[in-house]
């Protein structure tokens, strides 16, 4: 089976293609001009080189099979692998953006886009609150399949080349359980799509022994930890992974994470009614994160079919956040985008092609 051209970093292509400058030209066609056929690249390449590319590589290995749009402008995408017909989802989040004009000091309003990508089909972690785990684990996604999620979404929305995206690994799967492909995808996002590592966030459920491996790669990405509880008993009931990597174990590795001067590690905390949303939990969380440059992102539980958990009130979430902020721990409440199309946090899963999304 031919290799996908999107699976190769710029360095790998430079070593493979002769002369090596062909790699940069090819990257320009792929990631700046969105060409999906080697024949469309004939302005730069000879017929013999085009024939070589067609013989050795394939381009698109996934396709969009369905799109569902939210009232807030967000979109959920169902992708199908052209190799094995398995499906997976990704989400485009559309948000308002405000910037200050440096010359006039005027406030400029615009839009910013975040693509929430999947790195696995299904998930092995088995978090009790997450819909993804309902379908079990199928396989890891290749770097090319991760990259194409962002490319296809950007094309589908006619976003200009220069329009920067934020990439968050918060879709289906645990990024640290597919670390090699995730890291390769990040390198290609950076060198191919020109997405700064500062715009890329990896969210992990806390695979503690792989956090230092990720840190050692010096990718410059942002780290987010799915914490969701302040004691091991509660966290283990929500996240079975905690039995292997408990809270203390995870936090010990987080403390070693290299941070730029103004950066913080994000801790994601899912608020579930009458389980972990009280002020007693907020006080324990404050104590847990003492000494760590951190910020807390509160997520109100997003209901899905078959779940026993309930969404807490916005009032209780605000009380939780206000307490942490009053004590000097930066805390925000995540706006639940795309809730009406079941594309919010914890609502993605593999679907049969006959199913609606």
UniProtKB/Swiss-Prot annotation:
It catalyses: adenosine(2503) in 23S rRNA + 2 reduced [2Fe-2S]-[ferredoxin] + 2 S-adenosyl-L-methionine = 2-methyladenosine(2503) in 23S rRNA + 5'-deoxyadenosine + L-methionine + 2 oxidized [2Fe-2S]-[ferredoxin] + S-adenosyl-L-homocysteine; adenosine(37) in tRNA + 2 reduced [2Fe-2S]-[ferredoxin] + 2 S-adenosyl-L-methionine = 2-methyladenosine(37) in tRNA + 5'-deoxyadenosine + L-methionine + 2 oxidized [2Fe-2S]-[ferredoxin] + S-adenosyl-L-homocysteine. Its EC number is 2.1.1.192. GO terms for biological process: rRNA base methylation; tRNA methylation. It is an enzyme of class 2 (transferase). The active site is at 89 (proton acceptor), 345 (s-methylcysteine intermediate). S-adenosyl-L-methionine binds at residues 173-174, 203, 226-228, 302. Disulfide bonds join 116-345. Keywords: 4Fe-4S, Cytoplasm, Disulfide bond, Iron, Iron-sulfur, Metal-binding, Methyltransferase, rRNA processing, S-adenosyl-L-methionine, Transferase, tRNA processing. Pfam families: Radical_SAM (PF04055), RlmN_N (PF21016). InterPro entries: Aldolase_TIM (IPR013785), Methyltransferase_A (IPR040072), RlmN_N (IPR048641), RNA_MTrfase_RlmN (IPR027492), rRNA_lsu_MTrfase_RlmN/Cfr (IPR004383), rSAM (IPR007197). Residues 109-340 form the Radical SAM core domain. Its main location: cytoplasm. [4Fe-4S] cluster binds at residues 123, 127, 130. GO terms for cellular component: cytoplasm. GO terms for molecular function: 4 iron, 4 sulfur cluster binding; metal ion binding; rRNA (adenine(2503)-C2-)-methyltransferase activity; rRNA binding; tRNA (adenine(37)-C2)-methyltransferase activity; tRNA binding. CDD domains: Radical_SAM. It is found in: Cytoplasm. PANTHER family: 23S RRNA METHYLTRANSFERASE, RADICAL SAM CORE DOMAIN-CONTAINING PROTEIN. Reaction proceeds by a ping-pong mechanism involving intermediate methylation of a conserved cysteine residue. Specifically methylates position 2 of adenine 2503 in 23S rRNA and position 2 of adenine 37 in tRNAs. m2A2503 modification seems to play a crucial role in the proofreading step occurring at the peptidyl transferase center and thus would serve to optimize ribosomal fidelity. This is Dual-specificity RNA methyltransferase RlmN. It comes from Helicobacter pylori (strain P12).
């Amino acid at each position: 089976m031919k290799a996908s051209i999107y699976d190769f970093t710029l360095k790998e292509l430079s070593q493979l293609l002769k002369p090596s400058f062909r790699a940069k030209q090819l990257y320009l066609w792929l990631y700046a001009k969105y060409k999906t056929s080697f024949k469309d690249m004939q302005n730069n390449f000879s017929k013999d080189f085009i024939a070589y590319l067609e013989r050795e590589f394939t381009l698109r290995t996934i396709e969009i099979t369905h799109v569902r749009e939210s009232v807030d402008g967000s979109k959920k995408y169902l992708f199908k692998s052209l190799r094995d017909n398995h499906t997976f989802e990704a989400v485009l989040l559309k948000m308002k953006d405000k910037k200050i004009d440096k010359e006039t000091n005027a406030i400029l309003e615009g839009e910013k886009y975040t693509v929430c990508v999947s790195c696995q089909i299904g998930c092995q972690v088995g978090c009790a609150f997450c819909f993804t785990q309902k379908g079990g684990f199928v396989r890891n996604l290749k770097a090319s399949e991760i990259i194409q999620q962002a490319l296809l979404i950007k094309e589908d929305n006619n976003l200009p080349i220069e329009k920067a995206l934020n990439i968050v690994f918060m879709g289906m799967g645990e990024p640290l359980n597919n670390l090699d492909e995730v890291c390769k995808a990040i390198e290609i996002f950076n060198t191919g799509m020109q997405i700064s590592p500062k715009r890329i966030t990896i969210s992990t459920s806390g695979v503690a022994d792989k956090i230092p491996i990720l840190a050692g790669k010096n990718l410059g990405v942002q780290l987010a930890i799915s914490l969701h509880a302040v004691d091991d008993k509660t966290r283990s009931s929500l996240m079975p992974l905690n039995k292997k990597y408990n809270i203390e174990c995870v936090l010990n590795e987080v403390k070693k994470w290299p941070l730029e001067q103004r950066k913080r590690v994000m801790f994601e905390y899912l608020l579930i009614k009458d389980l972990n949303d009280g002020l007693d939990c907020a006080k324990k969380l404050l104590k847990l994160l003492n000494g760590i440059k951190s910020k807390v992102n509160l997520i109100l539980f997003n209901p899905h079919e078959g779940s026993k958990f309930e969404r807490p009130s916005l009032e209780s979430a605000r009380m939780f956040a206000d307490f942490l902020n009053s004590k000097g721990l930066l805390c925000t409440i995540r706006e639940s985008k795309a809730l009406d199309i079941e594309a919010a946090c914890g609502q993605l899963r593999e679907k049969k092609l006959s199913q609606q999304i």
